[in-house]
C-alpha cells in the first residue's frame, strides 16, 4: 500500500490525493474511450512480482504480461531483446486485439530505452535517445499542465546526450545543464 501511494505521488507529481484522483480519473476515461493494452515482457526474475499487474489495470489499462516464470533472453532492455515484446504485440494484433498498442520490458535502473509501439502495421522499438526525449517532453509538458505559470524549469543531462533535448527544452522554456558522463555527475548537477 505504501509503495502504491508513492507511485501515485510520482505519477501525479503531487502528494495531494484529490489531484491524484483527478488525474487517474482522466486516464481511466481516456482508456474507456480508446482501449489500451500494455504488453510487458517480464523475462522472469523479480520483475514478475512488480506492482504493474495490479496497478496498471486499476488505472483502466489492460495489462498483458508474458515470460513471467523464467528468463528467456538477456535482461538488458535494448533493441535485440525488445524484439520479443514486439513479436508478442504483432501476435496479439494478428489475433484481433487492436488495443495492444504499447509494450515494454522492465529496466531495473531505468537508463535504457524500453518501449515498443504499434505503428499501424507492425510493432517497432523506440530507440533509447527517443525514449529519453519523450520522457523530457512529457515531464516538462506535465509540469505546465499542473501549473501553467511554472517558471525556471531545467533538465540535467550527460554531455553526449542528444541535442534534441536542447530543442525540446527551448520550445518549452526550460534550460539544459550538461554534466560529465556518469549518472552520479548528472544527479549531482541536478
What are these regions (language model features)?
Residues 2-190:
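Phosphate-binding chemistry for phosphorylated carbohydrates and sugar-nucleotides
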